[in-house]
Amino acid sequence: MAFDLNNFVIDRVVRGIAVSQGDNEKLGIAKGDVLFSINQITNPSLNCTSESTDAVDALSVPIATFYRAKSAEFSAENALFDMNLIATQSGTKKQVATAATTIDTPCFETIDIEAGKTAYTLAHLPVAEPKVYVLKGDGTLGEKVVVGSAANGTTIVISEKAVTIGDGYAAGSQLFFMYDYIADGTTGNGAVEVMNSANNFPVGCKFIMEILGADVCDQTNLIYAYLVFPNAKLSPDFDWSIATDSTHPFSLKAMQELSLLTM
């Protein structure tokens, strides 16, 4: 007997994948490339609407209704913040630091002063001379530290990654360093970047969502259902609450699928 299904019981959404509809030389994306793949989807919702026009008689009584201009919008949240998703929402691509494509990266670093120790090493090689402050007990910044050519009193010396302090700091005190470094993907020197620019917007995509469920009459055999948007546009609008329990929201609109015929 041919497979048939009517009443479908949903267990959960397994994953959602968006693939590129075409080549994008600017972003280095080829047709069919995965733009993002997420597997922590929560609160998925599909909203379908249309516009109606009523035909009326001489007394303005509706005698017929015609519908046109269908539209569909899908919205959901990913339980985890996803770099590829926000890159697609921003109309760009996630950049990973390598030797060929380095990333200028900011760094906040704290050094704990130990008794009798004057030499310390920064985690990264600064691009320019770091700005240094005394770190107060409540975590706020105190006096600015002078960086000189000789370590004396509260004056310190910075040579590449090496830091030499004077004798003006008590054991247990802290110095706060602010600097930029070049991430090149080597061990301990990696970075990932997503840039949201004013002139970049999401590209068209095909979105496929995998849903796990079962026939209401046979819940022992699980069935995979697929919700497919052949021509979709991810919205660049999103509200991201930056907190431990926050989610990553996204929405997309379904577009009419058109084919360009060539002779």
Residue ranges and their predicted role:
Residues 2-89, 144, 152, 225-249:
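Solvent-exposed edge beta-strands and adjacent loop segments
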Residues 39, 47-49, 77-79, 114, ...:
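A structural detector for beta-sheet-dominated domains
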Residues 84-152, 180-206, 210-221:
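Extended beta-strand solenoid/passenger and fiber regions
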Residues 78-82, 181-183, 211-215, 231-236, ...:
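Beta-strand elements of well-folded, non-transmembrane domains
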Residues 69-73, 166-176:
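Extracellular interaction modules
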Residues 25-27, 83-84, 168-174, 185, ...:
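Short, surface-exposed beta-strand/loop "edge" segments at domain boundaries and coil↔beta transitions
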Residues 73-77, 176, 206-208, 249-253:
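Beta-strand secondary-structure signal
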Residues 137-138, 157-160, 165-171, 222-263:
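Mixed-charge, glycine-accented linear interaction segment located at domain edges/termini
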